[in-house]
Amino acid sequence: MKTKIILILFLSIGLIGHGQVMTLEECIRQGIANNLTLENSRIDINKSRTGISQNRARLLPVINGVFQFTDYLKRPVNVTTGTLLGNDFPEDPTWQTIRSMQYNVNAGVQLNMPLYNQVIYASIDAAKTVEQLSHLSYEKAVEDLTMQIGKVYYLAQSSLEQTMLTDENISRMQELCAITEAMYEQGVVLEVDLNRARINLQNLKAQQDQFAMLYAQQLNMLRFLLDLAPEEQLEVERMPRDIVQINISGISHTLPELRMATKQKELIDRKITAIKAEYIPTISLTGYAGALGYQDKINHFFHTKASSQNWFGNCFIGLNITIPIFDAGSKKLQIRQHKYDAEQAINRAELLQDKIMTDYSNALLQLDHNIEVFQTQTQSYQQACDVFKVTQEQYREGVSSMTAILQDEMQLRTAQSARTQAHYLFNLAQLELLRLSGNLLSLTEK
C-alpha cells in the first residue's frame, strides 16, 4: 500500500513537472479574474447600487388600481331628520331612516407621491455610503486574495526547492553508498558502516516523498485560489538563487481597512441622521379617481338598465401632512445605540492603526533577520559543501570514518534547509511590507 501511494505521488509530480509554469504575477492576475470570493464581492457592489436605486424610487409617485366588491349581509342604515330629505317627506318627522343597498362596487385609481420627506433623502445618503463600503470591501478582498496566493506560491516554491535539493542529497548519498559498498567488499569498512549509509539513503527518500506530497497539496490549494480545474497542470517557478529586495515605502494611510473603518463610522452617522429626520413632518400628495356603484341585486350590475344608472363618480386630490408627536422615546433610544456604535467604530479604527504600525515594525525586523540568516546560511552551505568534499575524499582513502562523513552530510543538509526556510520567510515578510505600504498590486505590474 505504501509503495502505491509513493508511486502515485511521483506520477503527480511528474505530470506537474510537465505542466504550465506560472509566475506569481500570472497567478495573481488569474486569481483576481476567476476567484469566486471576488465574484461575490462584485455582486455585493451591484446589490448596493440597487439599494440606491431602491431608495430613490421612493421619491416617485405610486399608482395603484383599486377594486372592491362588498356584499352587506345585513344592510347598513343611515338615520337623519326628515327636514334634510326634502319636500317628499312629512314636514315634521321625528327621525327618518335610510337603508343602503346590499351590493356595493368601488373601482378607481389611487395616487400617492411624497413631496417632502427628509427620511428618504437621508436613506439615499446612507445607501451611497453602503455602496462605497462595498467597493472598499472588494479592494480588501482583492488584497486578501493576493496575500493568500502569494503565501501559497512562496510555500510551493519552498517545497519545490526542498524537493530538488533532496534529489541532490539522494544522488550524493547513493554515490556514498556505492563507495562504501565497494570498500566493504574489499574489507576496508565494516557492515555497520554500509548499513548506516543505506539507512540515511532511505531516510532521504522518505523525506523526498514528504516534500513531493506537500508540493502537490500546495499546488492543489493554488488551483483552488485560481479557480482552476483539479486536473489542470500547473507548476510554480523555482525559487531564485538569491533574495530579491524591493524598495518599500512607509505605511500607507489609504489602506482598504483604514478607509473601511472611516466609512463605517460615516455610515453610523448617516443612520443617526436618518433617525433624526423622522422627527420632521412629511408632506405627500394623494389623489383618487374612480366610481361607486350600488344595486339591490347583483345581476343588476350587468343585465338591467339600472346597471348604468346607479354609478357615481368619485375624484379628489389632496395633501397628507404627518407630524410626529410621541413615539415613547423609540427614536431617542435608537440614536443612543448608534452613538455607542460610533464610539466603538472610533476605537476599532485606532486599534487598527496601532496594529498596522506594529505589523509593519515586526515585518521590517523579520525582513532584516531573514536577510542575515539567508546570507549566513548561504556561506555555511558553501563551506559545508567544501568540507563534505574533503571528508568524502578522505573517506575514500580510508582516513575519515563513516560517522564523520555522515555528520558533514547532515550539516550540509541543515544549511540547505535553513537557507531555503530563510528565503521563504524573507518573501513572506516582504509580501507583508508591500501590503502595509499599499504597493501589493505592484506584483501584477511586473
Predicted features and spans:
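Sec-dependent N-terminal signal peptides
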Residues: 4-14
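Bacterial Sec-pathway N-terminal export signals of envelope proteins
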Residues: 19-68, 74-75, 230, 235-271, ...
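Amphipathic alpha-helical coiled-coil segments
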Residues: 40-55, 141, 147-164, 182, ...
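Periplasmic alpha-helical coiled-coil/stalk elements that build and connect Gram-negative outer-membrane
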Residues: 50, 142-254, 366, 370
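Small/polar-residue-enriched beta-strand and adjacent coil segments characteristic
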Residues: 62-73, 81-140, 262-271, 278-351
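Acidic, low-complexity, intrinsically disordered peripheral segments
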Residues: 64, 73, 418-446
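Outer-membrane beta-barrel domain signature
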Residues: 70, 74-77, 81-83, 196, ...
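Short, charged, amphipathic alpha-helical segments
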Residues: 128, 191-200, 336, 402-410
